């Protein structure tokens, strides 16, 4: 966060610039080839400028402008986190930790493949959901501007003043979401664990599918 202020006899100014970056609680598991992350993140870029123009000893004109750009990313397709995170914590509480490892590795060299563990009863691997089940991304741009006229009338009555203000606000929100199904595997033949034939597959890996978007734009005067 950087602030700069100053001025002259006829003008005063204050400016502020901010960058904020917050990451989620989870490790990065994503295997998305497009570079989208499985962990949640929130970024904000903000700028503000306040300008006061002393037109006369009694008349002051002010312009205040603020803008911020926010970006949110997260796993799966539920920006409210009610779906993905609630389901993750539910599965952690209801899946025995000793039942199976998080994943298996089969094959050798460049042919190695990660298989996410599961069973006929517990097919929803939490790590697999974060790594492969999709993501959302939303952006929000907010502009706030106001114009103020302040006129002191001490010449008429001491302490008397008139002030007027006009404000204009702009808010644009856009969110898009993608989703995919994922497979889990149960090891049946422990003597041949390096071969995919030793596993029973539940569900199927699918390509990311576009779920749609949500877009709103608001103007206020």
What are the roles of these predicted feature ranges?
Residues 1-18, 22-25, 38-123, 136-140, ...:
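Flexible loop and strand-edge segments within Gram-negative outer membrane beta-barrel domains
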Residues 5, 113, 148, 191, ...:
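Intrinsic disorder/low-complexity detector
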Residues 15, 63, 147, 162-164:
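Membrane-embedded beta-strand positions of outer-membrane beta-barrel proteins
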Residues 20-44, 72-79, 134, 138-144, ...:
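Small-side-chain secondary-structure face that scaffolds active or pore-lining regions
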Residues 50, 146-148:
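Low-complexity, intrinsically disordered or weakly predicted helical/coil tracts enriched
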Residues 114-125, 195-204:
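Active-site-adjacent bridging/hinge elements
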Residues 128-130:
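Surface-exposed, low-complexity/disordered Ser/Thr/Gly/Pro/Asn-rich loops and linkers
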């Amino acid at each position: 966060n950087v602030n700069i202020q100053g001025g002259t006899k006829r003008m005063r100014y204050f400016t502020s610039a901010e960058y904020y970056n917050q990451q989620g609680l989870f490790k990065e598991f994503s295997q998305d080839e497009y570079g989208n992350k499985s962990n949640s993140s929130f970024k904000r870029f903000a700028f503000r400028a306040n300008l006061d123009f002393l037109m006369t000893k009694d008349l002051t004109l002010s312009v205040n402008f603020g803008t911020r750009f926010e970006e949110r990313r997260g796993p799966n397709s539920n920006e409210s986190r009610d779906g993905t995170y609630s389901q993750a914590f539910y599965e952690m509480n209801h899946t025995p930790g000793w039942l199976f490892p998080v994943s298996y590795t089969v094959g050798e060299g460049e042919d190695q493949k990660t298989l996410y563990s599961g069973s006929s009863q517990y097919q929803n691997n939490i790590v697999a959901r974060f790594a492969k089940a999709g993501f959302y991304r939303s952006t929000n741009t907010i502009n706030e501007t106001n114009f103020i006229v302040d006129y002191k009338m001490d010449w008429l009555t001491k302490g008397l003043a008139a002030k007027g203000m006009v404000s204009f606000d702009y808010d644009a929100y856009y969110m898009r979401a993608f989703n995919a199904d994922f497979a889990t595997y149960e090891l049946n033949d422990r003597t041949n664990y390096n071969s995919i034939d030793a596993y029973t597959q539940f569900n199927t890996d699918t390509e990311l599918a576009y779920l749609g978007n949500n877009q709103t734009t608001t103007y206020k005067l």
